[in-house]
Amino acid sequence: MPRFIDRVVVHARAGNGGNGCASVHREKFKPLGGPDGGNGGRGGSVVFVVDPQVHTLLDFHFHPHVVAPSGKQGAGSNRDGAAGADLEVKVPDGTVVLDERGQILADLIGAGTRFEAAAGGRGGLGNAALASRARKAPGFALLGEQGEVRELTLELKTVADVGLVGFPSAGKSSLVSTISAAKPKIADYPFTTLAPNLGVVSAGEHTFTVADVPGLIPGASEGRGLGLDFLRHIERCAVLVHVVDCATLEPGRDPISDIEALEAEIAAYTPTLQGDSTLGDLAERPRAVVLNKIDVPEARELADFVREDVETRFGWPVFEISTVAREGLRPLIFALWDMVAAYRAAQPAAVPRRPVIRPIPVDETAFSVVPDGQGGFVVKGTRPQRWVAQTNFDNDEAVGYLGDRLARLGVEDELLKLGARPGCAVTIGDMTFDWEPQTPAGVDVHLSGRGTDVRLEQTDRVGADERKAARKARRQSDDGEE
């Protein structure tokens, strides 16, 4: 029997963007072809997709690292690099995605539902895209951005119409195996069921699903027994059924005290989803009580004795059954279907889910410069850190281009205001370098274009009119000599 895993930590790494290409067009009779380096391809993203054929998170338990392919590098002749393919990861229906802080990022319900877990990095620009009027032939290109890396927690919350709750060895697994084709493990010791068991039940021409939740004990909401590991599986159930063992010989236990103890644990449990929007609050779900094991004479007497008290105290329908003798099962099945159908009809129609984009406001032009306490400075900001990550520091021209961009952003002016001196250490992102101002303090910054092809600036080239005038002058001189 495959292991049931309903909570895992996944390390998702999106693909990096491809590097841009620094290339010059070469063709016969075109000495000044200009830059033609293509851009790098976008990195692949990690996408979770709901697959109804997947029922557990077992694959992530053994393979927690998910890595998407990176984009390809750009090439000459204005050829852009190929984008990395998105990695689609199949997850079961009912998976909840949480971030490192425990905040819910997505609640994946319904076949085909998608969620981008980690975004791929953007490709670097080639020198053709970097060319401008002031920089006609850049000798460098930008590196691709790093893909997003995230540590996510996946929780599986069983999607079922009816949830069976009760003390250990109350007969929940036996009931599921009797009214459906499910074959859970059944034994005569507590906590035999270590994972929820799903079964499909037929009520005439109608069907509904039943989930057998592992046994609960007082203190489960605080982690006792199997605790919170399986309480979350009742969050999506439309109907909750208390399965009570009327044949138990444990002192201090009776059907009413068992129901009250379990209701206290359910009330103390705080759902992660704060109630499914299509089902309402957990405390408002309809309930039923099943008095089990009436094939035992003493259990039948107890069930007959407490049935009226249970109905009066809680106001829920009560059923007496025996899974061994298969007694009382048919009325229970049709009654559960009526409860499920009535509850579905009473709920408002589910609004079709529409993609909602909630962009996080980011001021990319903002940056801050703070002293590091050792005579250096640390520059923080979205743009400066991204620019540094995209710079090839082995290329002097690329470093100069980075300096121009930082100066335009105002980083150099801010360093001068804080008293930075030439040669002091400046840290941006993961890079620390010795800072040298482009101009002395107090002098306006005049930026010069970098990457200019000197051949384009030549003024001694002879034009057609000049050659024509030279030929005319030579003919006149030849005629004069004759």
Curated annotation (Swiss-Prot):
A GO cellular component annotation in the UniProt record: cytoplasm
Residue sites binding Mg(2+) per the record: 173, 193
Cell location: Cytoplasm
Ranges annotated as biased composition (Basic and acidic residues): 452-468
Magnesium listed as a keyword: yes
UniProt key word GTP-binding: yes
Domain OCT intervals: 359-437
Spans annotated as Disordered: 450-482
EC number: 3.6.5.-
Binding site for GTP: 166-173, 191-195, 212-215, 292-295, 322-324
Cofactor: Mg(2+)
Record's protein name: GTPase Obg
InterPro entries for this protein: G_OBG, GTP-bd, GTP-bd_Obg/CgtA, GTP-bd_prot_GTP1/OBG_C_sf, GTP1-OBG_CS, GTP1_OBG_dom, GTP1_OBG_dom_sf, OBG_GTPase
The gene coding this protein: obg
GO function term, MF aspect, one: GTP binding
Gene Ontology process terms (BP): ribosome biogenesis
SUPFAM superfamilies, sorted: Obg GTP-binding protein C-terminal domain (SSF102741), Obg GTP-binding protein N-terminal domain (SSF82051), P-loop containing nucleoside triphosphate hydrolases (SSF52540)
Major location category of this protein: cytoplasm
Domain Obg as annotated: residue spans: 2-159
